[in-house]
């Protein structure tokens, strides 16, 4: 989003207040879009259920540099001004980010609104690398949904957390016969 913001300001097609208003309109529009009904959930029951979209602000750029920019601060302003539940927001804090960015986010957290959540980008990066992700994918990832971390554009987080309890019981009872429960042979 930042390249469009910077270009608009540079060529005069966008003013700071217009950018703020566009972001506020996005927040309102997003908040008015309930999630589609889930399996076994009617449209009426789903009317106030959201898809847990999460706006990531801050963190690192693809080259490993500080990912905070003027738009990051504007988004924090909008989060504080709008105080609506969707989209959820989070800040990625890295040792490379400027202290005023962290302090600005903490001033919003202090209000008790519950947003933005705060994630340690450096720890997320280490976890991604430990899990075998490339450095580029690790830098380009973050949190999605509630708190799941993923490499954006490379993988998906399942938010439902459904458990197949009958399958677990079947595996527990028939572990010696792995083929009978569709597991094949141990590798």
Residue ranges, per PLM feature:
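Conserved catalytic cores of very large enzyme subunits
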Residues: 1-187
């Amino acid at each position: 989003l930042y390249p469009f913001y910077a270009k608009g300001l540079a060529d005069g097609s966008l003013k700071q207040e217009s950018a703020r208003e566009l972001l506020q309109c996005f927040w309102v529009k997003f908040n008015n879009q309930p999630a589609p009904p889930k399996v076994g959930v009617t449209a009426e029951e789903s009317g106030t259920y959201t898809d847990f979209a999460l706006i990531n602000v801050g963190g690192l750029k693809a080259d490993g540099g500080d990912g905070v920019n003027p738009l990051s601060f504007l988004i924090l302003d909008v989060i504080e001004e709008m105080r609506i539940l969707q989209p959820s927001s989070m800040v990625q804090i890295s040792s490379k980010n400027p202290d005023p960015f962290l302090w600005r986010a903490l001033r919003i957290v202090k209000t008790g609104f519950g947003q933005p959540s705060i994630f340690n980008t450096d720890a997320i990066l280490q976890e991604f690398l430990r899990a075998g992700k490339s450095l580029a994918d690790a830098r380009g990832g973050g949190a999605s949904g509630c708190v799941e971390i993923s490499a954006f554009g490379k993988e998906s987080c399942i938010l439902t957390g459904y458990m197949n309890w009958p399958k677990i019981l079947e595996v527990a009872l028939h572990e010696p016969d792995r083929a009978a429960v569709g597991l094949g042979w141990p590798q």
